[in-house]
Design a protein with these regions (language model features):
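Rhodanese-like catalytic fold shared by cysteine-dependent sulfurtransferases
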Residues: 2-18, 22-25, 33-64, 71-112
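N-terminal glycine-rich beta->alpha transition that marks the start or flank
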Residues: 29
Length: 112
């Protein structure tokens, strides 16, 4: 068991696969808008950690499957906690984009 797994941070690659298989699922990037614009996982929505109360503008169903990620897993752990407090029960912290092995979108990947 790795350090991040021990701390409750999920495996982002396995988490993305689970997200793709899930119905009524949302992938939420809790990093800042600037970080999100630089790079993000396709299909994700940006909802910064300091705006968790804005989740209702993205996810109306409190029983939906919500997968949260950040850079390394720390902010997404806090986001999971805050979303649980707001009544969203099916929230998974899938860890950090730094460990993601898939395709990313964002400014970093466009020719200038």
């Amino acid at each position: 068991m790795g350090l991040f797994s021990f701390l409750g941070f999920g495996n982002i690659n396995a988490g993305i696969e689970e997200f793709k298989r899930s119905k009524n699922a949302y992938l939420i990037d809790v990093r800042t808008p600037m970080e999100y614009k630089e790079e993000h996982i396709p299909g994700s929505k940006n909802l910064p950690l300091d705006n968790m109360k804005g989740i209702s503008s993205i996810v109306k169903d409190k029983n939906a499957n919500i997968f949260v990620y950040c850079l390394s897993g720390g902010r997404s752990a806090e986001a999971k906690h805050r979303l649980n407090q707001l009544g969203y029960e099916n929230v998974k912290n899938i860890g950090g984009i730094a460990s993601y092995k898939g395709i990313l979108e964002g400014r970093r990947y466009h020719a200038s």
